[in-house]
Design a protein with these regions (language model features):
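Extended, low-polarity segments enriched in aliphatic/aromatic residues
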Residues: 3-125
């Protein structure tokens, strides 16, 4: 089950980070419709948004997801083909591409087990 996988990712992350100093960096670039771990993929669905960083991995993931949700889509990809006349700012692009997944459940669970908090303050530099 995908939900169980998301829960395990949170649990493994907590185990790795427990009692260790940590800092997290996300590159919000070339956001593709499939996992970037796949050996094939489609064109990026949004413009490059930059780099985000935090000591809190949950806040970082939530901030990055919100930035993707609020970004317009770009053409020439799977998402643009299914929504050709929409910019989709404010729409959950992850859910539009994969309606059977619930990425938010992983963040809620990560917060529940004490990995971090979904609350964040976005500071642009």
């Amino acid at each position: 089950c995908i939900r169980d996988s998301n829960y395990k990712i949170a649990e493994y992350s907590k185990a790795v980070l427990l009692d260790k100093p940590n800092f997290h960096i996300s590159f919000i670039m070339n956001v593709s419709p499939e996992c970037d771990c796949w050996n094939h993929n489609d064109a990026a669905i949004i413009p490059d948004l930059g780099i985000a960083a935090s000591f809190d991995p949950v806040a970082l993931d939530k901030a990055c997801a919100d930035m993707v949700i609020n970004a317009p889509i770009i053409g020439g990809n799977k998402l643009a083909e299914t929504h050709p006349h929409e910019h989709l700012e404010g729409e959950d692009k992850f859910h539009l591409i994969h309606p059977d997944t619930n990425w938010q459940a992983g963040l809620r669970y990560a917060e529940e087990i004490g990995l971090g908090s979904q609350a964040y303050e976005l500071i642009t530099v």
